[in-house]
Design a protein with these regions (language model features):
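A short Gly-Trp-Pro
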Residues: 1-114
């Protein structure tokens, strides 16, 4: 599944209107090497970890304490980002008025649990 997160934390972390993530079950993923992890309190008030490439510093992944069985990858960092299509927009209450979301995605004012 792919989702767009419009929370202020993702906006600040990406320097963009939202972060586009492809979400996978953590058990189905293996990484070649270990990202550099940065732990913060997200817009939900819960801890999140953002993983960055240790070679170039590009943002790669996100792990949520609130959803320990999944891992998100920045969609544009994947080998074939066109393979994924957003199904959901999260934290739409934080979206900018000029951020035109796709009409056919599920919209949530808060996070996954809302």
């Amino acid at each position: 599944m792919m989702l767009n997160c419009h929370c202020r934390d993702c906006q600040r972390a990406t320097g963009s209107a939202y972060a586009a993530f492809a979400i996978f079950p953590k058990a189905a993923v293996s990484l070649k090497g270990e990202p550099c992890w940065y732990r913060v309190i997200g817009s939900s008030g819960k801890p999140i970890e953002r993983g960055f490439c240790p070679t170039c510093g590009n943002p790669m992944t996100v792990r949520l304490d609130a959803a320990p069985d999944i891992i998100g990858f920045h969609a544009a960092s994947l080998d074939d980002p066109a393979r994924y299509r957003p199904a959901m927009d999260l934290f739409t209450a934080s979206a900018h008025p000029w951020d035109l979301m796709q009409a056919d995605t599920i919209k949530k004012a808060g996070g996954l649990a809302s």
